[in-house]
């Protein structure tokens, strides 16, 4: 299986214990972990463009497939929220029209299938779409994601970066989230004493692809 970069918009470490997850806490003890820093306001499109461009810039190509990270890694894109509907082999509208179960399962299914042939950059938007206005279903959303990550690892993916570009929603406004997201990966973050910046996630995935594929 080829390396994968999977971003989950709007999850935080604090809910791993609260929601009694199994897979993600176990992964934290096996591979490298850290904290992603992204100051308010945080928007999905701007956050993901920073990752795809590998630098903190407002320069956004009209076609995400032309972004530097995609061109360098030749990665397939799945459900990337730089536009609405999302961009890639699987795509949804950024509203609540697609259930969180449907999105998560379809993204992971497409990811496993595609990673057999190429590196993959994928996103899950469910926490961001549903938890701004309904915290009561938080652990249901987390549990579906946790189970899907287990399927991903059991599917043979061994080189990966799992992250959230920002933490949980903390209010009804779109750009209002906790400022620290998760980083769980088979490649070490650049500074163990510091947070991971968004543009560094793109650089780390580039390095992961190069080291895994020997290019």
Model-predicted regions and their roles:
Residues 2-3, 10-116, 198-215:
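Active-site-proximal alpha/beta segments of enzymes that process anionic O-linked groups
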Residues 129-133, 166-177:
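Histidine-centered active-site/metal-ligand motif
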Residues 173-212:
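Substrate-binding rim/cap in mid-to-C-terminal beta-strand-loop elements of soluble/periplasmic
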Residues 20-26, 138-141, 176-179:
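Glycine-rich, phosphate-binding/catalytic loops in enzymes
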Residues 54, 123-125, 186-188:
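Structured loops at beta-to-helix junctions and adjacent beta-edge loops in soluble globular domains
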Residues 10-13, 82-86, 125-129, 167-169, ...:
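Short, solvent-exposed loop/turn segments at secondary-structure junctions
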Residues 3-13, 23, 141-173, 183, ...:
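Metal-dependent active-site segment of extracytoplasmic phospho-/sulfohydrolases and closely related
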Residues 100-116, 120-122, 127-162, 200-202, ...:
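A long, amphipathic alpha-helix that forms part
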């Amino acid at each position: 299986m080829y390396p994968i970069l999977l971003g989950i918009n709007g999850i935080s470490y604090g809910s791993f214990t609260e929601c009694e997850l199994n897979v993600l806490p176990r992964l934290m003890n096996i591979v490298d972990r850290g904290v992603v820093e992204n100051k308010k306001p945080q928007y999905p499109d701007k956050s993901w463009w920073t990752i795809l461009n590998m630098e903190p810039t407002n320069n956004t190509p009209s076609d995400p497939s032309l972004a530097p990270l995609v061109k360098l890694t030749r990665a397939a894109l799945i459900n990337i929220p730089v536009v609405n509907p999302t961009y890639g082999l699987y795509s949804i509208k950024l509203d609540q029209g697609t259930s969180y179960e449907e999105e998560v399962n379809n993204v992971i299914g497409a990811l496993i299938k595609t990673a057999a042939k190429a590196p993959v950059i994928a996103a899950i938007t469910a926490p961001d779409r549903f938890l701004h206005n309904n915290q009561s279903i938080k652990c249901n959303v987390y549990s579906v994601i946790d189970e899907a990550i287990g399927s991903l690892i059991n599917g043979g993916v061994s080189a990966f970066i799992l992250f959230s570009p920002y933490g949980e929603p903390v209010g009804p406004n779109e750009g209002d989230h906790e400022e620290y997201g998760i980083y769980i990966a088979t490649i070490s973050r650049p500074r163990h004493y510091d947070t991971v910046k968004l543009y560094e996630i793109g650089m780390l995935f580039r390095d992961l692809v190069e080291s895994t594929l020997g290019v």
